[in-house]
Design a protein with these regions (language model features):
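Residue-level detector of alpha-helical secondary structure
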Residues: 58, 81, 141, 145-148
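Residue-level detector of solvent-exposed, low-hydrophobicity positions
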Residues: 28-29, 87, 94, 147
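Short, surface-exposed beta-edge/turn micro-motifs
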Residues: 9, 99-100
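Intrinsically disordered, low-complexity regulatory segments enriched in Ser/Thr/Pro
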Residues: 2, 7-51, 105-142, 150
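Negatively charged, low-complexity tracts enriched in Asp/Glu with abundant Ser/Thr
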Residues: 1-4, 44-99, 119-127
Length: 152
């Protein structure tokens, strides 16, 4: 069943409270593993650059291409048991976030959707940054840096 597979879409939060970046895969069933409080990857915001985040995002998208929702859930539970308690779901993380992005691929573009981190706007969509799929990873990292500029 195709709907049971994880989409090639990743949510990226900059967690201001804990000074971390969180990457979450999204799926077609529950709009994202973050609903379950299962983060896929976390990075220290002070020491992680945009190029590293792009490589990790593309790696996570590759992982999502072949894994089913059930398998991924079991894998994430095993890998992140201690971290599950940190955030029980996306609302708490969204409140603490100073950046909320969704990164995904279309047939011919690499896209970053930028959402508001202001409490009164509750994650409202702002705009999309696009690059051709043929672009270099450096160009993808520049696009991510451009997205972070929105939050300054």
């Amino acid at each position: 069943m195709a709907d049971n597979y994880v989409q090639k879409s990743v949510s990226l939060y900059r967690d201001a409270k804990n000074n971390l970046y969180w990457l979450f895969p999204n799926n077609t069933i529950e709009r994202g593993f973050y609903i379950l409080g299962l983060p896929a990857k976390k990075f220290d915001a002070a020491s992680t650059d945009c190029m590293t985040l792009i490589h990790e995002t593309l790696d996570l998208m590759q992982y999502c291409r072949s894994v089913t929702y059930d398998d991924a859930t079991q894998d994430l539970k095993a890998r992140f048991k201690a971290e599950v308690k940190l955030w029980s779901g996306s609302p708490g993380l969204q409140k603490a976030s100073s950046a909320v992005l969704t990164i995904y691929l279309t047939d011919n573009e690499f896209c970053i959707d930028v959402f508001s981190a202001k409490k009164e706007e509750r994650g409202a969509y702002k705009y999309t940054i696009k690059r051709p799929l043929e672009a270099s990873h450096e160009e993808f990292a520049e696009a991510l840096n451009e997205a972070f500029e929105f939050y300054k």
